[in-house]
C-alpha cells in the first residue's frame, strides 16, 4: 500500500495547501432543544443545517416514525423490484404527486440519486436527447448528465438569452430537455422559471426542475417555487427532497404516469438499491401532510430570514442579497473563511460551516447561513456581533450588499 498511500497523501496535502481541507465536526443535535447542539461538552447554536423548518423534531413526524418502527421494524427488507412496495412508500408517493399536481411520483434514497439516475436514464429512454443545463447546477445533475454521455450544452447562470441561443443551435426536431434549479443553494438566487418554460415550449423541450431547496418552504401547500408561481402543471418533471424542509431523508421525482413508469423500469439508482424503510417514508408523509395545511412554520421562517438580513444590513456584513431564505456571507478567501468558521464555533458557540472551492468558485468562498423558525432575536444579534468582531480581528472588510453583489456576479461570469 505504500505506493498508493503516497498518492493519497499527495492528494490530501494539495487540498490542505489550498485551504480546502474539510473537517467534519462531531455534534450531538438536541431534538427537544432545536437549534441547539452539543459540541465538545458545550452547547452551541447551529446556523447551517438544512432542517429548514425543524420538522425532524416535530411531534407529529417523530410519533409517526415511532409508530411505523413498532409496526414494520427498522429496515425495508430490500429493493422494491424484488421485495415489493410497502404500503407506506406508496402513500408517500401519492402525497408527493398531489403536492406538485402531478399524476404520480417515484421515491429514491436521496435527492442526489433522484437527479443522477433519472437524468442518466432519460438518455437511455429518449434516443438522441440533448441536455441544456445551467452552469451552476448541483453536482448530482452534472453527474447524471455526464454519465448519460448524451449531447449537452451548458448555459450561463440564469441567463435565458444564452439558453435561447443554444436552443436555436440545435435542430428543432431533436428531443431536448432543460435542467435547472428553482433556487441555487450556494447563492440563493431564483431561476427565471416562467421564462425557461416559455423557451421550452418554443423549442419543443422537456423541463426538469430541481426544487430541493424550496419544497416545504414556498407555495400554499409547500410545493416550491413552481407552486408559488402557479406553473407546476407546465413543468414536465419536478424533483425534490425529503431531507431538508421535511426533516427526514430521501429524494423523488414527480411527473406523468408514462415517464415515471419508464424511469422505474430503467433507472439503476432505483432498481438496484434498497428502498427507504417505512420508518422514514411514514415520517416523511406526515411531514408533508402537516406542511400542506400549516403555514405557521413558513411564516415564522420568513420572519426570521427578514430579521437576519436586516441585522446584517445594519452591521454592514457582506451577505449576498437575494429573495430567498439562503444567506451567503462572502469572505473571498479559503483560509480566512475557515478561520471565521472555527472562531465562531470555538469562541462564540456558533456553528456555521465554511464553503470553499470546488463547491463555490475561487474568490467567492463563504459562510452559508440557514435561518430556521427556532432562531431567536438574541441568536440573530449574537451572530451579527460575533461576525463584526471576527471580521475586525482577521482584517476582513465590511462592505455594502450592493457592492458585494456586483463583485460576486463578476466572479460567476468569469
Curated annotation (Swiss-Prot):
Modification N6-(pyridoxal phosphate)lysine, positions: 244
Binding site for substrate: 22, 133, 152, 359
Keywords (A to Z) from UniProt: Acyltransferase, Heme biosynthesis, Pyridoxal phosphate, Transferase
Pfam families documented for this protein: Aminotran_1_2
Top-rank taxon, per record: Bacteria
Matching InterPro entries: 4pyrrol_synth_NH2levulA_synth (IPR010961), Aminotrans_II_pyridoxalP_BS (IPR001917), Aminotransferase_I/II_large (IPR004839), AON_synthase_class-II (IPR050087), PyrdxlP-dep_Trfase (IPR015424), PyrdxlP-dep_Trfase_major (IPR015421), PyrdxlP-dep_Trfase_small (IPR015422)
Cofactor: pyridoxal 5'-phosphate
Pathway involvement of the protein, from the record: Porphyrin-containing compound metabolism; protoporphyrin-IX biosynthesis; 5-aminolevulinate from glycine: step 1/1
Keyword presence, Transmembrane helix: no
Any one GO MF annotation of this record: 5-aminolevulinate synthase activity
E.C. code: 2.3.1.37
Catalytic activity field: succinyl-CoA + glycine + H(+) = 5-aminolevulinate + CO2 + CoA
One GO process term, biological-process aspect: protoporphyrinogen IX biosynthetic process
Active site: 244
Residues given in the record as pyridoxal 5'-phosphate binding sites: 185, 213, 241, 273-274
Similarity remark: Belongs to the class-II pyridoxal-phosphate-dependent aminotransferase family.
Subunit structure: Homodimer.
Protein name listed in UniProt: 5-aminolevulinate synthase
Provenance organism: Rickettsia typhi (strain ATCC VR-144 / Wilmington)
